[in-house]
């Protein structure tokens, strides 16, 4: 799971490594969406020799495997047999390396101050296609029994869960074509910027495969190691993965019921509130955004406080004054190419989606797709 335009953040709790092609303060490895990456060319020359035996010969890898063996009680022979076939992935290291962004000058911005290119309407366009909406309805229809159960146990609307999976992988069509073992080995031992993080993911992945009786080399996913319909990183599978069809296994690659239950479980764990909306249109300014300390993912203020700060609410606004919210800015371009901003109040449900992917663009695209799926003719 998949990347942050205008969110001003620095940490990644749900590390799906989803990487949006828009600027913001995500960790360095969050630059490209897994679903986008699967279509990239893998034919470039590798930076290192992709010998299958290289990793097992390295002292740091042997030390790591010994620690995994000790911590998870996995036979050393199994670990060595599996890691012996791991190959260095130039693609994973290249795509994880951040690239400089091309700045532009806003019409109303001083000439000496540059702002990054950001256009939510362009970002959201492919996620709101007629095909993605229609496939979303099909996904809900064939999993009706599963969603009926999720309604009772979790209270997350089916169209929201469907939209997350639709944005992440087009309902399982683009789950990634990279060997997860190769990606995680490369990012653990050759990509030093995030080695500690990826070693934890690799250890969790090996433990999961051992317990589920899966050969790690057979698992395909994103270049960053995200897996399945919802693009969960291994630690997220371990923490929030659910056996949706009660068959005794958690399969987020081949089992839609497990994927649906796991996405719902994640959202609930991060504050999803049944019966509450997600985004509400308001009028605001950049000055208000800055003055109220906005820009994070938490609902850190209230409707009443933002109204006092100058945010204009529409008549018959449905949220109470003490409702926790955050101010959301979605920059985009008009027909003449000039930047302007649409403003919204996001509820704790918007924050829950942001914990899946710390990007206002991402969470808003999921929200819009969910709305289109719910309202489209059956």
Describe the residue ranges of each PLM region:
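Short, conserved active-site entrance elements at the starts or edges of catalytic domains
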Residues: 204
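Amphipathic alpha-helical interface segments
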Residues: 222-229, 236
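Acidic (Asp/Glu) carboxylate-rich active-site/surface patches
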Residues: 16
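Cell-wall glycan-active module
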Residues: 1-4, 10, 19-193, 199, ...
